[in-house]
Swiss-Prot record:
Gene3D superfamilies: Ribosomal protein L9, C-terminal domain (3.10.430.100), Ribosomal protein L9, N-terminal domain (3.40.5.10)
Protein name per its UniProtKB record: Large ribosomal subunit protein bL9
GO CC aspect terms: ribonucleoprotein complex; ribosome
Gene Ontology MF, one: rRNA binding
Pfam entry (one): Ribosomal_L9_C
A Gene Ontology biological process term: translation
HAMAP family registered for this protein in UniProt: Ribosomal_bL9 (MF_00503)
Gene this chain is encoded by: rplI2
Job of this protein: Binds to the 23S rRNA.
Key words, A-Z: Ribonucleoprotein, Ribosomal protein, RNA-binding, rRNA-binding
Protein family according to the UniProt entry: Belongs to the bacterial ribosomal protein bL9 family.
Amino acid sequence: MAKRVKVALTESIASLGKEGDLVEVAPGYARNFLLPYGKAMNVTPAVLKQIERKKEKEKIAADKLKQEALDFQTALSTIGRFTIKKQVGEDGVLFGTVTNGDVAEAIEAATKKEIDRRNITVPDIHNLGSFTAKIKLHPDVNAEVNIEVTS
């Protein structure tokens, strides 16, 4: 059986793993491809410490983002209801529909915080009334907001 070499990946490689992973590869693969192209580094105690520090920083940053998402979720629930004005025909049906972009604009106007419209799920809204939209603020944090559609 051939000897394997342990390397630390400096970028994600689909067949091996993601950045920062320690993997064992064939010596030729490491020597001829991974190391010369900067896709991996030889494992040394200094490299291990560097990877550990980087993972700690990433964890702190991820925790901070999650806390910001939780705070924004609380702010959204405190506001309660967002009003969207749309034109209505004589039969009470909207001209067009309420889109996730409309909801994002209403939230941005009320909270002064930008939100990506692609993270908002809105039911099909063709009439006036109250509806609920779902927002993905973070992979672990979701929020629901009430929308009031008026003319």
